[in-house]
């Protein structure tokens, strides 16, 4: 910095709150003539606690020894310490080396004021390298606290936040002309080179840092992806290489394996590739099964009978959302009709479309849990105590069709539903008792439509052919029309299911037709035990796995509850033995002898029906 003209110039710093900055005092600077000097190296400390500090200037070698004012200045303030403008120091800190143009109050007399008034940023060659030693080396230096500087210079220093420079120091330097060429061009270049490295870091305290996203934990049951063919080869060869070179690093082993893989024959590579393809197929299968298991994690279990009736608790929604295209409206206007229940033993192999009676069209599904007391031991042992009830429709009387059943689409990959005798008997007991408490536990697959107040018995005792009806007292009438299907009877319920309800009155007649053999034509087989009462006829489509759809008509009549049916027994007339599980005779006979006798009886009956007068002997 150069003071031209050799005149006595005064630097006035206003501020009554500190003795160094009082307005009454003026700092008398010595007359230096035309000499040029540079401020010694100053380093900029970014510590917010050192927001404002005094700058130490060393002017020992630059002072005029013949000046009389030099002695008084040294006696009063010390030769080594000269309090340079505080605003200038803060301007250096705030602007990254440039002076604060508006917040510095300087009264420069004579030629200095006229030369610098048009360009407020004063150009000073300040190599900022070591400011700490100059600041901390002199104990007599004082600092101004934050509030004083804010009130005096109009600076904002809140929260230790350093404002970014409004104008780059290069622009300030380039737009500020040096009045008397006091700064060397080399010094300016050095200053510009040092500025980018010395810029202070802008600290933003107002913004909150975003929390890092938590990665979802991997399910240990999820199948692992198969590795590549090269990875399989790496596993096989890594142990051998490690055995030969125990001190080899992983990088060295990788290089050796890579070279071995490159030199490997195509046929040997194909072996690893085939292993990878097989593992990939297994992975895709396991992944599909895993996803299906995740979508429908339903467990069916039986509960103990609760003698205390409780209020109906809301049932959970079905496993898969119902199709909105075919909603079945709920109906509660069936006081005189029996409940239509189809019992199924699969776990969760269908999607339920249930009558929408709740707010927002959400499906309301009533669960029916058959208690352990009503389940025979054969059910608990064979089916594991798992019972699934397919919800059927509740219909109004006088033949009004209410809606379609809430049976849903069974995917081809899902297991077909198998209707068993023991499950049907359990459903019959549940429907007859009508004293089931509201369910305590409600597994999703166990579903049934709301029950009407009448007591009814529903029995479907149809296993694979030959068709056999349950023994029932006369008040109960069951008519089943079912085409013969290859055993065992595996059926799908195909959407949209066709369900009709009609009301008929039948005369009190009893008809019976002989049982059909296994290879009989698909004629309707009817077993009737009727009474002159209203009949609820339910028609549903039952489709086997491979065969074409067949129609099953079930007519249910109102009447008194019927006792439980006996345990399954051999099909041959007169044999009371339970059937033996065998694929040769469709699990319907107890032995080979019963199979032969039954076939002989059926054949003799057929011959007798065609020619009553002839007598046929069969060996």
UniProtKB/Swiss-Prot annotation:
Query: Disordered: where is this region?
Result: 155-227, 306-335
Q: Which SUPFAM superfamilies match?
A: HMG-box
* Keywords attached to this entry: Chromosome, DNA-binding, Methylation, Nucleus, Phosphoprotein, Transcription, Transcription regulation
Entry-annotated residues carrying Asymmetric dimethylarginine: 479
Comp. bias intervals (Basic and acidic residues) = 183-193
**Ranges annotated as biased composition (Basic residues):** 208-218
Phosphothreonine modification sites are 176, 313
Q: Where is this motif: Nuclear localization signal?
A: 213-218
Q: What is this protein called?
A: TOX high mobility group box family member 4
- The species this protein was found in: Mus musculus
């Amino acid at each position: 910095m150069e003071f031209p003209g050799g005149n006595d110039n005064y630097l006035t710093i206003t501020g009554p709150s500190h003795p160094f900055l009082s307005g009454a005092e003026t700092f008398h600077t010595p007359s230096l003539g035309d000499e040029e000097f540079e401020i010694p190296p100053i380093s900029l400390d970014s510590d917010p606690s050192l927001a404002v500090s005094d700058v130490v200037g060393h002017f020992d070698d630059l002072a005029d020894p013949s000046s009389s004012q030099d002695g008084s200045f040294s006696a009063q303030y010390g030769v080594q310490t000269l309090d340079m403008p505080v605003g200038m120091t803060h301007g250096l800190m705030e602007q990254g080396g440039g002076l604060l143009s508006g917040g510095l109050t300087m009264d420069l007399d004579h030629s200095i004021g006229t030369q610098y008034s048009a360009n407020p940023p004063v150009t000073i060659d300040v190599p900022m390298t070591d400011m700490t030693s100059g600041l901390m080396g002199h104990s007599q230096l004082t600092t101004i606290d934050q509030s004083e500087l804010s009130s005096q210079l109009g600076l904002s220093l809140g929260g230790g936040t350093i404002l970014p420079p409004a104008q780059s120091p290069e622009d300030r330097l380039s737009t500020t002309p040096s009045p008397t060429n006091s700064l060397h061009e080399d010094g300016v270049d050095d200053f510009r080179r040092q500025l980018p490295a010395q810029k202070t870091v802008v600290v933003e305290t107002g913004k909150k840092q975003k929390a890092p996203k938590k990665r979802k934990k991997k399910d240990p049951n999820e199948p692992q992806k198969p590795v590549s063919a090269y990875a399989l080869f790496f596993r096989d060869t890594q142990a051998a290489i490690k055995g030969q070179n125990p001190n080899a690093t992983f990088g060295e082993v990788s290089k050796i394996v890579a070279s071995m893989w490159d030199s490997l024959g195509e046929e040997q590579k194909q072996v690893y590739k085939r292993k990878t393809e097989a593992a990939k197929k297994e992975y895709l299968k396991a992944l599909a099964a895993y996803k299906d298991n995740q979508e429908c994690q339903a467990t069916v279990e039986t509960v103990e009978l609760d003698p205390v009736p409780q209020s109906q608790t809301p049932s959970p929604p079905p496993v898969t959302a119902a199709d909105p295209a075919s909603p079945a409206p709920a109906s509660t206007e069936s006081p005189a009709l029996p409940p239509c229940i189809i019992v199924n033993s699969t776990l969760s192999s269908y999607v339920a479309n249930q009558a929408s009676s709740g707010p927002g069209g959400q499906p309301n599904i009533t669960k029916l849990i058959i208690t352990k007391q009503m389940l025979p031991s054969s059910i608990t042992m064979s089916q594991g105590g798992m019972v699934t009830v397919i919800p059927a429709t509740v219909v109004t009387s006088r033949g009004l069709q209410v809606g379609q059943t809430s049976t849903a689409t069974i995917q081809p990959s899902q297991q077909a539903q198998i209707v068993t005798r023991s499950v049907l008997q359990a459903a019959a007991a549940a429907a007859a008792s009508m004293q089931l408490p509201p369910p305590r536990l409600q597994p999703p697959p166990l579903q049934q439509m709301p029950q009407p107040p009448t007591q009814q018995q529903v029995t479907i005792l149809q296993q694979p052919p030959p068709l056999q009806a349950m023994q029932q007292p006369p008040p109960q009438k069951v008519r089943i029309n079912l085409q013969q299907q290859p055993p065992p009877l595996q059926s799908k319920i195909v959407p949209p299911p066709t369900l009709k309800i009609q009301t008929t009155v039948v005369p009190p007649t009893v008809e019976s037709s002989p049982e059909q053999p296994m290879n009989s034509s698909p004629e309707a087989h009817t077993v009737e035990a009727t009474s002159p009462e209203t009949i609820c006829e339910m028609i549903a489509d039952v489709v086997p796995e491979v065969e074409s759809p067949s129609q099953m008509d079930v007519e249910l009549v109102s009447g008194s509850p019927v006792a439980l049916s006996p345990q399954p027994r051999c099909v041959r007339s007169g044999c009371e033995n339970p059937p033996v599980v065998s694929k040769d005779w469709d699990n319907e006979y107890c032995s080979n002898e019963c199979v032969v006798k039954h076939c002989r009886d059926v054949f003799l009956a057929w011959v007798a029906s065609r020619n009553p007068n002839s007598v046929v002997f069969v060996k």
